[in-house]
């Protein structure tokens, strides 16, 4: 599992952030709350992550603190609830 990513914020949209780490760009799906607290383009950021693995996709979800990530991990264990941000 990828526990966190520290790198440069390259950009973001309404659902995700693009973070560059040593020349590799990671697209991280995040909530509006998390995205709004990241900072500005070019800032160094630290994002806690959860790698969601399905047979047809790998999705990296990002969080601003451990409480938010723990809640996400508990919610996705409930039948019928998926990880969509």
Give the residues covered by each predicted segment.
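Glycine/alanine-rich phosphate-binding loops at beta-alpha junctions
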Residues: 1
């Amino acid at each position: 599992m990828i526990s966190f990513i520290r790198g440069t914020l390259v950009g973001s949209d309404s659902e995700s952030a693009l973070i560059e780490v040593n020349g590799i760009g990671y697209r991280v799906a995040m909530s509006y709350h998390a995205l709004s607290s990241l900072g500005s383009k070019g800032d160094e950021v630290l994002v806690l992550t959860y790698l969601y693995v399905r047979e047809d996709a790998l999705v990296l979800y990002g969080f601003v603190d451990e409480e938010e990530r723990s809640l996400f991990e508990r919610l996705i264990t409930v039948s019928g609830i998926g990880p969509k941000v």
